[in-house]
Structures are given as C-alpha cells and as structure tokens.
C-alpha cells in the first residue's frame, strides 16, 4: 500500500519560524505514527485501515498544528483526533464500538497471551474492558495492550504519571470486580 505524503504546514510566519514548525510537526508525526497505527488497528481489527486512520489523523492535526503548539498538549490533541477518527471510521463501515473492541482485544490478547494468561475469555473480559469508563479504558489499553510507558501515557492523556497509575489501578479493580461477579453468577 502506498502511503500518502503529509502536507507541509501552511503558515504566515517568518521563514525561520515556519521551518521550525514544519520540523516539529514532522518529528511529532514520525514519532507518534507507529502508536497511532497500532491503536487504530486495535479498534478496527485491520492494520491497513489503521494506517489510513492514522494518516487521516495526521492530516487533521496538520490543519490545527499552530494552534496546538500555541495552546495545547500535542499528544492529547492527537489522541483526541485519533479517537474521533476511529469513531467516524467505525460508523462509516457499520462497525459498532463493542464489536470492534471485542475483535481488537481478541487479537491483542492472543498476541500477548502470557501477559493475560490469568484472564479467561469465557468470563467476558473483552466485554468488561470495552465497558470501562473512557479514561480507564484508554489508560488500560495503552499500558497493557500496547505496552506504552507511564510517561508517554501521561503526555497523551495530559495527566500526571501518578494519575495514570491510579487510573490503571482503578481499571484493574473494576475488571476484577466484574469478572468476580460473573464467576459468582456461573
């Protein structure tokens, strides 16, 4: 598959500033693209579609790059755009969030079987993960499925590392409680 090239930021800035902003954009996208592709692939279950979603995210980010640099956390802004693009793609392709999450986690769990050996598919772990509150879901997936470091997750979520650790801990507790409840029902 041929990858589209990213446009250069269009600026009304002096050439030196424009060049710096171009370099910052390109460096940011190059360093972020592998994670964006993996995250999108995780949700839609198809790497090629994940790449298209990630590139669309880069194009959208490019449109607001100056504003993002001036006012916001680029990692958080990019993650927001990426998640919006995933939702749009799922709607366009008639894939429900639960179905995409289930397929994605099934693939991710198989790939990291040893890490998740204690979780049994029959106990509805995929459903439980997909039903976590948004912030817990994001932190859990980034850490345990995609293997991101705490500092990287904190930048993407625009929170402290302590908040990331706490959020992941809360997600684990919620999952354990859900799985325990299902076990009692069986």
List PLM regions with ranges.
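Short, small-hydrophobic-rich alpha-helical interface motif
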Residues: 36, 40, 50-61, 153, ...
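DNA-recognition helix of helix-turn-helix
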Residues: 83, 151, 157-186
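A short, charge-rich alpha-helical start-of-domain segment used by transcription regulators
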Residues: 3-8, 12-38, 48-51, 62
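Acidic, proline/glycine-rich intrinsically disordered inter-domain spacer in sigma factors
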Residues: 15, 100-130
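A short pre-motif secondary-structure segment
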Residues: 139-143
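Σ70-family region 2.3-2.4 aromatic/basic alpha-helix that recognizes the −10 promoter
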Residues: 51-64, 70-106, 172
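C-terminal flanking helix
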Residues: 33, 58, 133, 137, ...
